[in-house]
């Protein structure tokens, strides 16, 4: 039986990825990132203050918030603000985004400033957290480039690029960049965050159906590295445009 994906993509093929800069007017950095039908608005906001634990230390901070619009999925979900608290999934994802982006920033060069990345899912079709990280990096880069242009900082605080992609085992085959039909029916699901130097920042992998073997893990990481190379090229092209 010939293996096929619901989308018709090959096992090592990303969905069509678009990175649109300056999508909104007011934020220092603003990006609409699309991975196929998944669309996330990422904005970077700069404030001249830091959390209490960093006051007087001369260091900056990078953090993130994440949320999904009520009808970003097949059925409407209540806004978390209406429920009075954020869910565990939301907190997990926004902490992941913050950790990923702090890994590419020299916080001493940033000075006592906070950059907040707000990642709002407009439409979800799998891979929202990886799309958010990939787009938020470009929004962050735009924000720090503006700080340099205005003379607010002298040294560029970015020490490399960061992107993320999902991989998984779907119907027994390792695949790259899972969409919703694959994500909801896969044997293994993994999110990979890397820098453009080839270093791994975070791996989140879970066996959904059956335990995965070491050779399958190696195959998944190889797929992630291939996809990451394409994503870094897209980020560079977007920032050069």
Swiss-Prot record:
The gene is rph. GO terms for biological process: rRNA catabolic process; rRNA processing; tRNA processing. GO terms for molecular function: 3'-5'-RNA exonuclease activity; tRNA binding; tRNA nucleotidyltransferase activity. PROSITE patterns: RIBONUCLEASE_PH. Belongs to the RNase PH family. Phosphate binds at residues 89, 127-129. Gene3D superfamilies: GHMP Kinase, N-terminal domain. The keyword Nucleotidyltransferase applies. Phosphorolytic 3'-5' exoribonuclease that plays an important role in tRNA 3'-end maturation. Removes nucleotide residues following the 3'-CCA terminus of tRNAs; can also add nucleotides to the ends of RNA molecules by using nucleoside diphosphates as substrates, but this may not be physiologically important. Probably plays a role in initiation of 16S rRNA degradation (leading to ribosome degradation) during starvation. Disulfide bonds: none annotated. It holds the Pfam family RNase_PH_C. Its EC number is 2.7.7.56. It is an enzyme of class 2 (transferase). This is Ribonuclease PH. It catalyses: tRNA(n+1) + phosphate = tRNA(n) + a ribonucleoside 5'-diphosphate. Keywords: Nucleotidyltransferase, RNA-binding, rRNA processing, Transferase, tRNA processing, tRNA-binding. Homohexameric ring arranged as a trimer of dimers.
């Amino acid at each position: 039986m010939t293996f096929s994906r619901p989308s018709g993509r090959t096992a090592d093929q990303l969905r069509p990825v678009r990175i649109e800069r300056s999508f909104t007017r007011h934020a220092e950095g603003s990006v609409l990132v699309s991975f196929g039908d998944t669309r996330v608005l990422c904005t970077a906001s700069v404030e001249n203050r830091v959390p209490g634990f960093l006051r007087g230390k001369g260091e900056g901070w990078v953090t993130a918030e994440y949320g999904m619009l009520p009808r970003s999925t097949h059925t409407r979900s209540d806004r978390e603000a209406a429920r009075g608290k954020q869910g565990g999934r939301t907190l997990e994802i926004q902490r992941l985004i913050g950790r990923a982006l702090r890994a590419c920033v020299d916080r001493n060069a940033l000075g006592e400033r906070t950059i907040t990345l707000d990642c709002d899912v407009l439409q979800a079709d799998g891979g929202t957290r990886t799309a958010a990280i990939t787009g938020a990096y470009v929004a962050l880069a735009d924000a720090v480039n503006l700080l340099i242009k205005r003379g607010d900082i002298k040294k560029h605080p970015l020490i490399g690029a960061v992107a993320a992609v999902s991989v998984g085992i779907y119907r027994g085959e390792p695949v790259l960049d899972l969409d919703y039909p694959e994500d909801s029916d896969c044997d293994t699901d993994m999110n990979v965050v890397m820098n453009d130097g080839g270093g791994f920042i975070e791996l989140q992998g879970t066996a959904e159906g059956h335990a995965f073997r070491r050779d399958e893990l190696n195959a998944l990481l190889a797929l992630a590295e291939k996809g990451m190379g394409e994503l870094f090229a897209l980020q560079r092209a977007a920032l050069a445009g």
